Structures are given as structure tokens and as C-alpha cells.
């Protein structure tokens, strides 16, 4: 190997290495649980967002619980924006895929399709198009075709209200520093979230790699 090539490879290695301290994430337990994810990873804003997913999601779940929704709807509200801890675009799809091995099909379906439904008002159930989106996208915004197709599919589906309920209990005020806790949902999580014994990210599920990314996003490779 030439000296020039060796130098190039070393430069690339340096670029991929942890050249700065990782994000100030608290170390995770050896066998991470969903509550650990909320308390230690979703507790801080990601990807430039002004709020943390934990506060927003627990507010949504609390609203659903107070309204007397069934436990799977409450869990779907609790998890609906967990995908934002992995990626901002298409967070509904990311979130649904992330939790799919651990929840019922109803819950993951609702999480997946809430993203499309949030762009479309449904006056019959009291859901108005959020003013926040007018500010984000403009008065005449038209969602892309895949969002429109997902909305139409969900609208005709027997589980439509599963996803629509997430939008109804979404908190569009998005408080910046809400007081929140995942503890009120511990029993619901225990009954409806299949926690792997090895811990999230350590099991052989199809999405274990996604949990590992969420847990340690600053790994070089």
C-alpha cells in the first residue's frame, strides 16, 4: 500500500471516528426497556426540533386516557411520534416499523397512517386542519401523492379511527417544556408492548438495528 493511499484511509478513518464527544446521552441499562427509551433518549429534542418527543407523546397519551380511550389507542398515542427519534421525514412509517415486532397490528397501523391523516380535516369527528401546518407549509399546500394515497387507503380501512384518534389527541400547541412522565402508562405498556428479555436493540427482531441507532446515534458505523 502506498503512503498516499494509507494517508487517505487514515483521513477517512478519522472522519468516521468519534472526533468529538457524543451527544450528552445518559448511558442506557444493559437491557433497555421502552420506559428507558422515553426517559433517557426521547427526553431531548432531535434533528433540530424545538421539543422532545417524550413530552409531546405523553401529553397525547394522557389526553387519550382522560377521554376514556381503549388501552391500545392510548399506547398508539404514546408511541405515535417515536419515529422522530430516528428520522424526521416519514416519521409515521419509521415509527410504525420500529415498534411493529412489539405491538399489535392495530397499534402499528395507527402509528403508520396518522402521518397522512394529519394533513386532512375530518369535520365528522371534530378534526380540523392544524394551523401549525398552515404556518409550516403555507395556505395552498398540497401533500405529495403518496400521502394522498395513504390517506385515501386509511379512510376506507376498518381501522380508520385508530389512526384518526391519534390526530384527535395530538397536542398541536407543542409545549416547549412540559411536565411529563411515562409512569402513568407503565401498566398499559406492560400489557400491550412485548418487551424483549434481552432488551430493545439486543434481541433478534427485524428492527433491533433501529433501536440500537436510537440508543447510540453517534456510533461511527
Name each model feature, range by range.
Residues 1-78, 82-221:
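Metal-dependent phosphohydrolase cores
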